[in-house]
């Protein structure tokens, strides 16, 4: 449990006061940003300040994590030699600070703000493959310096629209990004892992959302971590890269709910709010609930609140446990109390996860009529899934517990969370007993299937 916050890098005391606040709350991990700039590929930004900070953090029992994003969205893709120079910089950073053992490669590569291009001219997502190549090179470079270094991949945003034509934000959803990452890994023929942990940023869809609201597929929030685990299993099963069933872990290295400024602290802020924030009371309940919820999630290594203290400009970020004026929010006391009461220990049932072999949310609404005259020539039913899928459907002769011969057929695809009418070619059926049946296959893994069959219905002779 900790924070992602670069504020201690700007302090004159090596972060001592900042870390004292963390200690008071019970937080034990800080993520610091070290930007790689291709214009100055061997310059460690804030090196002297980091050198002053590391021993202070160690004394305070604070683990340091380096997040190493490229300076610009095209810093990696803009030059053929950039991935190699970035990996060399990681080695330089690891040798300069040998007591830091956790490195996050890049930041939100599924978002155009941090990685471009996301799509090619044909509309195909290209960011997963480009990032896979960088991650593979970075993993090998860091392990060559010290095999015990933990390499974190992803740092994924919780949302993406998968729309190459979206104005200004043509992004890739986390599920589809992981799918593309796995496809690139398999195509590369690599025999070593890509990462030791998956980094993920499960921000809420809206700051007014409760902790357990989550997202629809293919995006994901705190309560949808199983969706990411399934995506990872679909992408990497049977490869040298661990899946969550084989011990892969996850680090939620950015999370936060932005809060409205209370009147007594208004003088410490400037500008105008650009989102609809939640209340301080709601944030406190969410943060303490988050600590308890994740305590029962054995695959999560840690949670990092994004920002211990608010930024004073309202157009920026205000999700801290501390207000801009330095006063503690209710969430400060709530998290501290939860941790002090053993909130980091699971008090309920551990959420043990196993991969699914079925299609999530696959369902069908078949006609209720059990007897139909032979003059009927229209046949259809409603199908839906919780994830993208393809289907093969038919009207079959009923043959006990098995399907008989197919007399009508239809194939197609289903978009997640959108019901579709499966309509068969117009045709009269000869008298007899029939059933509808549909077989779903998950779009991200065709070996995951589900078959649904209706109760039998009778077609009887009519004039």
Outline where the language-model segments fall.
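Aromatic-rich peripheral "rim/lid" segments of glycoside hydrolase catalytic domains that contact
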Residues: 41, 109, 113-114, 120-125, ...
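Aromatic/hydrophobic beta-strand junction motif of beta-rich domains
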Residues: 377-385
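Short, solvent-exposed loop/turn segments at the edges of extracellular beta-sandwich modules
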Residues: 442-448
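Substrate-binding cleft and catalytic face of glycoside hydrolase catalytic domains
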Residues: 22-168, 205, 310
